[in-house]
Structures are given as structure tokens and as C-alpha cells.
Design a protein with these regions (language model features):
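Conserved N-terminal segment of class I S-adenosyl-L-methionine
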Residues: 1-84, 98-99, 103, 130, ...
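Conserved beta-strand signature within the Rossmann-like core of class I S-adenosyl-L-methionine
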Residues: 109-117
Length: 235
């Protein structure tokens, strides 16, 4: 009897419209188990996380999600190792409330991975209430409690940011940052991952990101992994 040839492992294909660099870096470089996927949409990011054995909890305004509704109004029953937030912040009417809730949803030392579109403020787009760059996103995160001094940033066709949850403190008083924009930038400067001053340039294209040739860890399923994006070419 002739032995059957071994089965060829499947090719697992993933297509990301947004967030490709952030999700690849997150899977490659960070150790975590649970993920809160805010604005999960069709679930492609969640599918990728699960392919690597992550436990994913999805949030969406409608559809088949673990938490259905406005994230700002949901009662979460746990904290998470990672909050994944891809192209959601630009839709928020209350950015401070949104980031405060993300901070509370993360475990101590948890990871926020956030992406947002980069388009000029002169351009008006359906549903996009804010326009972002590295300086503004870090400024808002610091006021929400995040120490961004070791954040990783990459601006391509979109802004990618990964930051660990470390509470932002004014070290000379060892106290949290006051709410609102009452603290001068020169005192907040140590909490940014790049030099800042007022007025200053907020367009920073890359900090602490490194090479864009991502080496993925072993997945939970055998076979080749193929990742494509309409906006980015991956090595």
C-alpha cells in the first residue's frame, strides 16, 4: 500500500485595512494573554490575535461582539493585558473620557496599542471629529495618566503608538498630572518620548519603533501566515 503524502499545512491569510504595523509589532515584541479590541468591526484583528492564542474580548456599537454599545458607557467586568484601539479615537466626541476609560481598563503594566489616521485638519471626513499627530496623541495620553516617555511611535499612512501603562507623575511632587491643560509643557516634557516645547513641532514620524521587518512568534495553528494590507508593504 502506498502511503499518502503528508498534508500540506494551510496558509492562513489576514488582510488589514488599518493597524498593520502596530499589530505586527505587538505580536512580535510583547508578552500578553488577554486583549480588549475596541471597535472590532468585522473582527480581522481579533482573528489574528486568536491565531496566536490570545483571549480576545470585542467591543462594537452593534453586531456580534462581547460588549455591544458605546465603549464610554459600557460596564467592564475585568481588566486586560492589552487594549487594541485601531481607528477609533478619531470618532470620539469626548476624547478625555475615552482615554481615561482605556487607562482604567488596562491592568498595571498593560499595553495600549492605538492607531489613528493621518490627514490634514483642512480635510473634513465623515465621522472623523479630530485629527492626530504624535505630539497631540502623547499630550492627551499623558493627561489621561499615561507616562509616554518610553512609547513607541511610527507615522506612515497612519499613526501607530504602543505604550505601557505606567502612571504619569510630576516627579518633583510625585503626584498625578492635574486634569485639563493646566500644567506647562516644559514640566510635562519628561513624560514625552521626544523633546517638546511650547510652541513646538508636534509632527514626529518615528520614535523607538525599530525595524519594520517583523518576526512573528509560533502560532497556535500550523501553516504559513500571510499578512497583507492595502496601505503597507511588509517584508
Amino acid at each position: 500500500m502506498t502511503a499518502s503524502p503528508p498534508a500540506t499545512p494551510a496558509t492562513h491569510e489576514f488582510f488589514f485595512e488599518w493597524g498593520v504595523h502596530a499589530i505586527m509589532r505587538l505580536i512580535e515584541a510583547y508578552d500578553f494573554e488577554t486583549v480588549l479590541d475596541i471597535g472590532s468591526g468585522q473582527g480581522e484583528h481579533a482573528r489574528f490575535f486568536r491565531h496566536f492564542g490570545k483571549e480576545v474580548y470585542s467591543v462594537n456599537l452593534s453586531g456580534n461582539a462581547d460588549y455591544v454599545g458605546d465603549f464610554n458607557e459600557l460596564a467592564l467586568d475585568r481588566q486586560f493585558d492589552v487594549v487594541w484601539c485601531s481607528h477609533v479615537i478619531e470618532h470620539q466626541r469626548n476624547v478625555g473620557v475615552f482615554l481615561d476609560k482605556i487607562f482604567a481598563a488596562l491592568k498595571d503594566d498593560g499595553i495600549l496599542a492605538l492607531t489613528a489616521p493621518c490627514h490634514p485638519r483642512e480635510r473634513l471626513i465623515d465621522g472623523h471629529l479630530t485629527s492626530w499627530n504624535a505630539g497631540l496623541i502623547c499630550y492627551n495620553l499623558i493627561l489621561a495618566g499615561f507616562d509616554c516617555s518610553r512609547a513607541c511611535l511610527l507615522q506612515t499612512f497612519e499613526l501607530n503608538l504602543i505604550v505601557q501603562k505606567k502612571r504619569a507623575l510630576l516627579t518633583e511632587q510625585d503626584r498625578p498630572i492635574a486634569p485639563g491643560a493646566t500644567t506647562p509643557l516644559d514640566r510635562l516634557a519628561p513624560l514625552f518620548p521626544f523633546p517638546v516645547k511650547s510652541p513646538g513641532d508636534a509632527e514626529v514620524l518615528e520614535v523607538n519603533w525599530g525595524e519594520r521587518e517583523y518576526e512573528l512568534p509560533p502560532a497556535s495553528y500550523p501553516g504559513e501566515i500571510k499578512v497583507t494590507s492595502s496601505h503597507a508593504t511588509l517584508s
